[in-house]
A protein has these predicted regions:
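Conserved nucleotide-cofactor-binding alpha/beta core module
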Residues: 77-187
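Class I SAM-dependent transferase core
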Residues: 1-101, 108-119, 183-204, 210
Length: 210
């Protein structure tokens, strides 16, 4: 495919997937219209970069559907200079978008996770659920996928009043959620059922019902 083909596909993604589905933040729209998503998927899957589903990467991981990324960015309300803790950076697509929005990004990815293809973010390799405490406190926790629960270890790395955007998975259903941390306590609200990739390493502890 030519660069013109990808530009046309990117424009179609914005018009048919984002604008029609409540992604109405013009800064987010502009960033997603500019950053070449095809550069963040394997070469053999570049033609799939703009489909409305997750794109397989490596080691069982996948790139979130465009709509999931757009909604996370919108609900994150990224401001210039925000310190963002990005969990599950994959190949760096969301890191590139967050950087385009003016954020200072610390991107966490597993040791055996995908190779980040964007050099704008500070990359930390290790357990996703451990975060990057050395860069704390953060203004925004951006979990780029769905988890069973947000670990306390991540909440503890956030500034008071910090924003949190994530997907939560329950009984096989993934939901977009957002919230804030006030006095060390995270409050999350469910916004919509939304297809998102499920990140490894975030299993909730088993709870017994009597």
């Amino acid at each position: 495919m030519t660069e013109q083909n990808f530009s046309s596909m990117r424009a179609a993604m914005v018009e048919s997937q984002l604008r029609t589905s409540d992604v109405d933040d013009q800064r987010v729209i502009a960033a997603m219209a500019k950053v070449p998503r095809e550069d963040f998927v394997p070469a053999e899957r570049r033609a799939m970069a703009y489909i409305d589903r997750a794109v397989p990467l490596s080691n069982g991981r996948a790139l979130n559907p465009p709509l999931a990324t757009g909604r996370l960015l919108k609900e994150g309300r990224v401001e210039e200079g925000d310190r963002v803790l990005l969990i599950g950076a994959a190949t760096g697509y969301s890191a590139a978008l967050l950087t385009a929005l003016g954020a200072k990004v610390t991107a966490v990815e597993a040791e055996d996770g995908p190779q980040l293809l964007d050099g704008a973010a500070k990359v930390v390799r290790g357990a996703l659920a451990a975060g990057a405490p050395e860069g704390a406190p953060y203004d925004l926790l951006f979990i780029d996928g769905a988890v069973e629960e947000v670990p306390a270890a991540l909440v503890q790395q956030l500034a008071d009043g910090a924003r949190v955007v994530t997907g939560l998975v329950e009984r096989g259903v993934t939901r977009l959620c957002s919230g804030r941390v006030i006095s060390g306590v995270l409050g999350l609200a469910s916004l919509a059922d939304l297809e998102m990739v499920v990140l490894p390493g975030f299993s909730a502890p088993e709870r017994f019902v009597f």
